[in-house]
């Protein structure tokens, strides 16, 4: 579903990439380049929503957020076999079980269960929606109903 590797820091690559991200092979640059293009440097809070196909992208976005002293959080719909990946990568993202027949449903339910004070802290974040098109569409509709502006939502389908 996704490729995990052990990145090693390299100061020359960091300078070339212009950010404090780990060195990566040419094949691994895609999520890093994508993350740099998507990242909203104007906001300090970044919220990720997706499935297991988005772990590499969200890991790259995490690196940019931490480099800029920004906050990030999110929720991923995952098959239970992939939950260990989040802790391996030290991603501060919650996971909910995937429902192949209803992508996005469990992530939306997770948001609905969020404490109102927590929502107040994150409602002005930039939201990164990635993964299956149905998940993205459903979650975008949910955010718009919660009065999140379209300008705050960035979508990446796989």
Identify the function of each model-found stretch.
Residues 1-158:
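Extended, composition-driven regions rather than compact fold-specific motifs
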